[in-house]
Amino acid sequence: MIQLSDEQLNNLDKEALVIIVSSLQDQLLALQSQLDHANAQLSDNNRQIELLTEQIRIMNQEPSKEPEITEVIIPSYHRKKAVGKRESDLSGLPARIIEHTLSDGELAVKFPDGYKELPAEVYKRLHIIPETFIVDEHHVHVYASKNNDGTILKAPRPKDLFRNSIATPALVASIINGKYTNALPLERQSKAFKTNGIQLSTNTMANWVVKSADVYLSLIYDRLHELIYDSKVIHADESPVKVMRIDHAKIKNGKKTYMWVYRNRTLRGTHPIVLFDWQPSRHSDHPREFLKTFSGTVVTDGYQVYHKLAKERRDLKVAGCWIHARRPFAEFIKSVGQDTAKGSIAQEAYSMITEIMHMDNTFDDLSVTERKKQRQLVLYEKVDAYFAWAKQKYSQITHNSTIGKALVYSINQEEYLRVFLSDGNVPMDNNYAEQAIRPFTIGRKNFVMIESSNGAKASAILYSLVETAKANLINTFEYFNLLLTEIPQHMDDKDLRFIDDLLPWSPRVQKECPSRYKKS
């Protein structure tokens, strides 16, 4: 950083001083952000130490008498519960009737002249049965001829999930669902099994998970990969993940690899598909291979490898994400505060982009053709005005400043940010992909890194089926249980059309694996 003397500063003109002050403000904000982050980390560490100290203190304490509770009622506003909501929440669950009666002797004393029974008072409570383990003991009946001619006949038996293994479809489905739906690492599941007297090591469970994905569930994944190409628009994103072993070679501290995600744009008559694709790098070869037979538009966050693919192929377009264009302005406003940001370039940019996006949202219920028409009529000039304004402001400020970098992102992405104007199928943002990859990033916080490249590939398949199942509103455990029950029985089939009957939106799956999730 160049340091100017007092004399040099006195000789500078007003414009130069404005540029220097603007640059110093940006540097100050950046340093403040770093300081806040460091303080937050320190605070988290202190909280963890306090929590550990408290746990040790509690463990060493003598049991004390439970204190009496004095109820204090504080008047507050409570939203009135919708009539029948509890009944709706409990509907469809298995029910058991618990009768509360009086004995004939008690009734005879109270009613010496006889009695009649009135309608019972009915109320409901929710009961839970913790995990229950049952041993399936199979008895395969064997028959022999009475003539002792050596003929022996066995009853047919279903094919095992794995040879000489105690694993059942329901058990493996529960493990997969725990890890990939509920972000519960295998180590924690192993401890939970142990508390129930079941010894299942993490290695055993990991082998079951990888084999299930590789041998059986990959068939569904491959079919979904074929079907996602039917979409006109695919959203794409990627997120890093560390892998400890690549092709059996152990890497100290793990290798930084990437989990790519692809999600189709669901319009009327289409089914949502979410596909994860693990790859050892962020190289353009990976999306090139995944999208090799796709023709249409890919919505991304501006990563240049997608732009490279679009330049290679005439049948592939790339659309930008306006939320990514708006985000740095929003972060700047948050860092300095709303009051300070009033009238700033960041506030003006944020307002202009937000207005365009809000207006586009009003076209959601229109047909593709009508949406394109309205965008051309209503939004085209506003988009033109935004880019003209951005270029003008960029020429007036320090290019390396926070706002300068935010403006240049929009300017560099202009070609891709404009694509939505000419295609009613294309949205203004890449939210589909960001929402699809979020469960993976949550799970990653728990498992930190993946043990092997085989495990990473299996994880891609399993996250794909979980997120596609959720998007199609089916129960993920029931779905995995069905798949692991049915697919092994078809492994010798040359005709793979049975797979379509097991896709998340098939009538059979929708009937057998309904989700009880209700949108509030």
Predicted segments, located by residue:
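Short, flexible loop/hinge motifs at secondary-structure junctions
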Residues: 1-166, 206, 235-236, 242, ...
